[in-house]
Regions:
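Glycine-rich phosphate-binding loop and adjoining helix at the ATP-binding site
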Residues: 14-42, 47-112
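Short, acidic Gly/Pro/Ser/Thr-rich loop/turn segments
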Residues: 2, 60-62, 122-123
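ATP-binding/phosphotransfer module of carbohydrate and carboxylate kinases, centering on a glycine-rich
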Residues: 1-49, 88, 108-109, 150-154, ...
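Short, acidic, Ser/Thr-enriched surface-loop or helix-capping motifs
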Residues: 8, 63, 127
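Activation segment
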Residues: 64-65, 72, 136, 166, ...
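Cofactor-binding loop segments of dinucleotide-utilizing enzymes, especially the Rossmann-like FAD-
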Residues: 9, 97, 118
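Glycine-rich phosphate-binding loop of actin/hexokinase-like ATP-binding domains
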Residues: 111-166
């Protein structure tokens, strides 16, 4: 899925749209993305006042370079995202998806906060004193690879016992429930199968 969000300088959402578009590294994917963005902005007045585009990506991004160092979800490694600026003719800023979600929170109100991202993989982000903490290698919120169960289940990264092997949506919905919503409902109902 791809989500388009138009946000004003007060961090208020002006417009939102989500479309189903399977990721691809093919040029046709980026052409379609550009078309969808133009369609999304078609009825927006003062488009010349748009300052830039933020793109959140599931993976580790090298700050300032637009290099996706690694993304398990997209199955990419050392992939340059820089060409997207030419695709959109606006400044483009890249950020990890969980970090983007953390920054979307009211960091003036929640000075110290933790965000957990539960998707195909387990991710997260946190802030201290209203500042996003990313760490030297941009992995500070990668909670999915903290060892939860020593010598436990094998994770896709090759290590044993990573939190991701137990807490990612795919792990929570394997044989027990068909969907994440069903799993959450089982938790609410305090069912032992959850």
């Amino acid at each position: 899925h791809v989500g388009f969000v138009l946000v004003n300088l007060k961090s208020e959402i002006e417009k939102y749209k989500r479309i189903r578009l399977e990721f691809s590294t093919e040029a046709s994917y980026y052409s379609r993305l550009r078309e969808e963005l133009h369609h999304f902005l078609a009825d927006v007045e003062n488009q010349d006042r748009i300052l830039g585009i933020g793109i959140s990506v599931p993976g580790i991004i090298k700050p300032g370079d637009g290099i996706l160092i690694k993304s398990h979800a997209l199955q990419l490694e050392n992939y340059s995202l820089g060409f997207l600026e030419q695709t959109f003719s606006l400044p483009v800023y890249f950020v990890n998806d969980a970090n983007a979600a953390m920054m979307a929170e009211d960091l003036d109100r929640y000075k110290n906060a933790l965000y957990l991202s539960l998707n195909n993989t387990l991710g997260g982000a946190f802030c201290i004193d209203g500042k996003l903490i990313q760490g030297e290698n941009q992995k500070a919120g990668e909670f999915g690879h903290m060892i939860l169960v020593p010598e436990g289940k094998q994770c896709y990264c090759g290590k044993l016992g990573c939190a991701d092997a137990y807490c990612a949506a795919s792990a929570l919905t394997d044989e027990k429930c068909q969907t994440l919503e069903q799993f959450m409902k089982s938790l609410e109902n305090k069912e032992t199968k959850a």
